[in-house]
Amino acid sequence: FGKKDSSSVRTGAIAIFFQSVLFVGHLLDYLFWHHSAALNFFSDMISQGLQTEVMRSFFLLSSLLVSIIGHRYLCRKGLKSGEFHHLTMLATAGLMLLCQSNHFLMLFVALETVALCFYTLVAYNRDSAKSLEAGIKYLIFGALSSALLLFGIVLLYGVGANPEAWGASYPEHESMDPLSFHYLGNLMSE
């Protein structure tokens, strides 16, 4: 973080170029070499199908547009843009993993990756007191919501006894499982 130097414009242009190549490559892969069957990777924690490909394309296009608009803003404000583009691409990778996650652990890790990038991007302008205040507030609210999400994941794991996202519906259990009513009662009492 710091003031603008001569390589800031070049760094942003290189990042935007590679994001464009990545988006076009992914779009060509989706349109011409699309795999019809759903694929699972990483011990079935990641699922790749038609819906995830559409969402990945959306996230790549959004990242490209954010980088173009953000680069203009950073040049106008006189801030370095190298870290901005790295954080944008890391957040994009986290969002792509988030839409592909098929397991609560992968969902949580991907969501936290995105959140950490967003915390830093919110407080990117270190010369602005408002930017730093917004970053701290976002960090505090994000930590609180992350804890609540983790408690919810543990609750679903306790009821379903399966950490997979689709396994949490627990079709093998009876519909009148007393354990589920116990957890629901504890949730409602708070």
Model-assigned labels for residue ranges:
Residues 1-190:
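Alpha-helical transmembrane segments of multi-pass membrane proteins predominantly involved
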